[in-house]
């Protein structure tokens, strides 16, 4: 087959810029090794002039955070007529909104933790005391607080004491105007990469995530040695099948395509609970998706090439 002219978008201006640069470099290296002509572009005000001059067969958006995973750049790529690897902009927006994604996936039959959303304005105008009291009465004191949108665990806190909740809310509001507060579900965290093929969506082996300090934070995600991964996850075949089914259901329900990552918690009874979906999953050297791809017996570059060719056609 002939080689492709591929533009990899990485970097950008979000809080996850450095992660995006690392993902983009790994994707570019894998595709270059397969014989393709790859250009890495750090999106700026001249992005579409650069793309017009390059005239790529396909664009690979290795973007994370706002303007990448929120569908904004995907919308513009589609409007400009470029083929790209990834979901539709509308699907990316659904996955980007954690509360909306939770609602849809729950309706599709996958467990989700009880939760409350709180806007920054409401937190200020109604008084922090009354809002915090409501959260405690509805969800208890052991909760997870996170921005309603965002990735890489930025602004995410696990709270076990009522006095720690105000600080966690402020941290979440640093990254978004709305905070999502969920009841803490004890269990094992797994990440499931889902790929699309001729026969539909397929879940790759689940990656079990065991951070050294017990919290899968930004540092634990991207600093080598901070987290131990088990691939496949250390669960029975029966539970593994449940995990795969939940991940595929979430992927399909949100309209994701080609490559996604679904994060789940497996409780003590072996039941998976949906945490969030990632429309443009991280592909760095410490990300779970490449681990899952390799564990499935597929060469990383071969899969990336297949995704690029499918998008180009």
Model regions and ranges:
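Active-site nucleotide/adenylate-binding loops and adjacent lid/helix of ATP-dependent enzymes
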Residues: 1-10, 94-187
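Phosphate-binding site of ATP-dependent enzymes
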Residues: 160-245, 271-273
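ATP-dependent carboxylate activation and anion-phosphoryl transfer catalytic cores
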Residues: 109, 236-313
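ATP-binding N-terminal substructure of ATP-dependent carboxylate-amine bond-forming enzymes
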Residues: 1-103, 107, 119-134, 306-313
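Short beta-strand-to-turn element immediately C-terminal to the catalytic PLP-Schiff-base lysine
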Residues: 118, 156-161, 194-197, 266-267, ...
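Short, flexible, mixed-charge acidic loops at enzyme active sites
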Residues: 72-78, 216-223, 279
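Hydrophobic beta-strand scaffold residues
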Residues: 38, 83-84, 112, 143, ...
């Amino acid at each position: 087959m002939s080689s492709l002219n591929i533009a990899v978008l990485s970097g950008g201006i979000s809080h996850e810029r450095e992660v995006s640069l690392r993902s983009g470099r790994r994707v570019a290296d894998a595709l270059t090794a397969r014989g393709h002509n790859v250009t890495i572009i750090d999106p700026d005000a001249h992005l579409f002039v650069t793309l017009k001059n390059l005239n790529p067969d396909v664009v690979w958006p290795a973007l994370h955070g706002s303007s990448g995973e929120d569908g904004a750049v995907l919308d513009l790529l589609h409007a400009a007529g470029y083929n790209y690897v990834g979901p539709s902009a509308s699907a990316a927006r659904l996955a980007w909104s954690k509360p909306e994604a939770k609602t849809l996936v729950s309706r599709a039959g996958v467990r989700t933790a009880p939760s409350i959303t709180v806007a920054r304005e409401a937190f200020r105008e109604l008084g922090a005391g009354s809002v915090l009291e409501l959260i405690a009465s509805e969800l208890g004191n052991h909760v997870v607080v996170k921005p309603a949108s965002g990735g890489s665990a930025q602004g995410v806190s696990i709270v076990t004491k009522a006095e720690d909740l105000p600080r966690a809310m402020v941290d979440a509001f640093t990254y978004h105007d709305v905070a999502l507060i969920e009841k803490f579900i004890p269990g094992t965290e797994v990440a499931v990469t889902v790929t699309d093929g001729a026969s539909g969506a397929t879940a790759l082996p689940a990656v079990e995530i065991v951070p050294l300090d017990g919290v899968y934070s930004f540092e634990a995600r991207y600093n080598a040695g901070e987290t131990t991964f088990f691939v496949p996850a250390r669960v029975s075949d029966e539970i593994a099948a449940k995990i795969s089914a939940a991940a595929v259901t979430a992927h399909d329900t949100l309209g994701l395509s080609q490559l996604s990552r679904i994060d789940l918690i497996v409780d003590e009874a072996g039941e998976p609970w949906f945490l969030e979906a990632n429309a443009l999953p991280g592909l760095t050297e410490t990300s779970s998706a490449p681990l899952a791809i390799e564990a499935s017996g597929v060469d990383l570059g071969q899969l990336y090439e297949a995704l690029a060719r499918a998008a180009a056609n």
